[in-house]
């Protein structure tokens, strides 16, 4: 089963994502609360997929995306953004994100995106 890293500064959002993915059979998770933790944990744990929030303290999602892709150009990363962050989403795709999910999102959209990227 795939290892999924969930990166969001909001603990409730990490929990919600994890619970929705658990319901569909995913069980191996790594969590980070900011971009700096995400980069460090990515190098240590090499997850199959990273769900990465854009707006976070310490190190934002775009910077973390760049650093993760520098350490592993094949890293599979999906950005999570709030409404109104379209320019950041475009930049994230330019930097190598494979997809994005706009918050708030339906659980079905989350699961389908994760499955599509992992195929």
What do the predicted segments below correspond to?
Residues 15-23, 90, 108:
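Charged docking surfaces used in two-component/phosphorelay signaling
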Residues 34-37, 60-63:
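Acidic catalytic/metal-coordinating carboxylates
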Residues 45-51:
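Active-site beta3 strand of CheY-like receiver
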Residues 56:
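Receiver (REC) domain active-site loop signature in two-component systems and cognate sites
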Residues 87, 105-114:
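C-terminal output helix
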